[in-house]
Amino acid sequence: MAITLLEGALYGFFAVTGVLIASFIIGEIVHLYNEKQSNENFAKAIDQMSKSTVTAIESIKDTTVTGINALLNMDTLRDVNSLAREKAKDQNPSSQAK
């Protein structure tokens, strides 16, 4: 059986169509894999940013608490100094007369 020219052209057409379909499928698989990798990397980046934000907020909170404690300590120190001056005045009335 000899293959006629028309049959040869038809087989060639099917072969080229099969190659094109196979390349399209492989291209889609590669595209979907790259998209999956991109989404995973994006999710990792968002997770890292969330962790950094939490760390920054905790740092701001700690700094604020430290500042408030420092202000309270200054106020307490002022009270202690006032009490010490009053006590010194009470114990040493002759120094006021000078």
Curated annotation (Swiss-Prot):
UniProt feature coiled coil, ranges: none
GO CC annotation: host cell membrane; membrane
UniProt keyword annotation of Membrane present: yes
Keyword Transmembrane helix (UniProt): yes
Subcellular locations according to the entry: Host membrane
Main location: host cell
Record's protein name: Uncharacterized protein 98
